[in-house]
């Protein structure tokens, strides 16, 4: 799978878990990307749960797609 396809897959997973999100993607290399997700606080755990296994599966394939979930109403306080 290409990095672009992996990013698209994770974005669809995020949107399925929480429709009211803002997603920002930064490609770090041909095999690595960082996805920042700004979501309502009530949806943060659902996004983390939904993306955990797909991200692990991508890592096994050699793609490092990191997902960081932030409270869209207070992004600085919830950085993890």
Feature annotation, model-predicted:
Residues 1-3, 23-26, 36, 69:
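Charged, low-complexity, helix/coiled-coil-prone segments
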Residues 2-17:
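Short amphipathic alpha-helix segments
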Residues 10-14, 45-63:
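Short, non-transmembrane amphipathic alpha-helical segments
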Residues 15-35:
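Short edge beta-strands and adjacent turn/loop segments
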Residues 29-32, 40-41, 72-75:
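Short, internal active-site loops enriched in acidic
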Residues 35-49:
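A short interface-forming secondary-structure element
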Residues 59-80:
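A short amphipathic beta-strand at an alpha->beta junction
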């Amino acid at each position: 799978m290409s990095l672009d396809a992996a990013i698209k897959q994770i974005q669809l997973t995020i949107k399925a878990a929480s429709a009211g999100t803002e997603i920002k993607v930064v490609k770090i290399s041909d095999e690595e990307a960082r996805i920042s997700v700004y979501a309502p606080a009530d949806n943060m755990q659902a996004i983390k749960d939904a993306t955990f296994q797909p991200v692990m599966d991508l890592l096994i394939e050699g793609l490092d797609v990191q997902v960081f979930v932030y409270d869209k109403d207070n992004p600085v306080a919830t950085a993890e």
